[in-house]
């Protein structure tokens, strides 16, 4: 196995390829724009139920009130298809209406995730990230993140993204 494509450095190697190989970059941008550009809005589970309609309207207002475009959040999350997983930490805030909303949804780069907290059944309970600025290890509980994994071919918490297929054989 090519050492550049193993361990945490594989995420940097893949990111470098995504930035510097035009055909790869074009494919990534095309896919991410397809998933991010539709108008995102919540649908009430029962359009005849006033509470369901109210909750859908609340979700729409949370998406509109966040400090970054929802399409940007979707694009960052969509990188799970390429890297195998993605982690976004949501930051809560008190809204003017007294409800809890989202201040932001911050991407946690794959190369910063060093360990996984997994129970005996394989359920991911959280992950540990190395802070790129301080090198401190920080715990991220699953309840505080959006964790998306491509687990069709593996039960690893890191999933198996399509970048894996770009690795050159080492011979």
Which residues does each PLM region occupy?
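Extended, helix-rich architectural segments
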Residues: 1-67
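Structured, contiguous alpha/beta core segments that scaffold functional sites
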Residues: 50-171
